[in-house]
Amino acid sequence: MITFYKSQKDVAQALKHLIDNYWEQKIEEEDFINRLNQIIANNQDMVFKDNDFTSQVKQRLGKKRMKLILKVTEEVSK
């Protein structure tokens, strides 16, 4: 699995695909959390701007997916 991406569009697309696979129960929860955190950690410069998600990532993922990402990242940071 690729975890380093070229552009914000590619990162957003990978996150969207990962979340959709999780919702369709194609991957286990633990694997989902690990992959999500790995993608975000390896692409922080494209995912975050001023300690918030970039507008392009937010727009491409939508509200429900962003809520899930925020919930998972908050759980991990505890």
Per-segment meaning from a language model:
Residues M1-K78:
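Acidic, Ser/Pro/Thr-rich low-complexity regulatory regions
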